[in-house]
């Protein structure tokens, strides 16, 4: 039971981490596109 809770928390943590990385990637892409123009 506690193992399931841990896995659930861990997957939530991974999702948040992925979302933050995605936002950073978007920001980097935006600045690169603006720098090119």
Curated annotation (Swiss-Prot):
Name the InterPro entries for this protein: Glucagon, Glucagon_GIP_secretin_VIP
The primary location reported for this protein is: secreted
Q: Does the keyword S-adenosyl-L-methionine apply?
A: no
* Triggers of expression: Produced in the A cells of the islets of Langerhans in response to a drop in blood sugar concentration.
Q: Name one GO cellular component term.
A: extracellular region
Subcellular location per the Swiss-Prot or TrEMBL entry: Secreted
Q: Which GO terms describe its molecular function?
A: hormone activity
Q: Give the keywords, sorted.
A: Hormone, Secreted
Family, according to the entry, reads as follows:
Belongs to the glucagon family.
What does the protein in this record do? Glucagon plays a key role in glucose metabolism and homeostasis. Regulates blood glucose by increasing gluconeogenesis and decreasing glycolysis.
Quote the protein name from its UniProt record.
Glucagon-1
- Species, as recorded: Huso dauricus
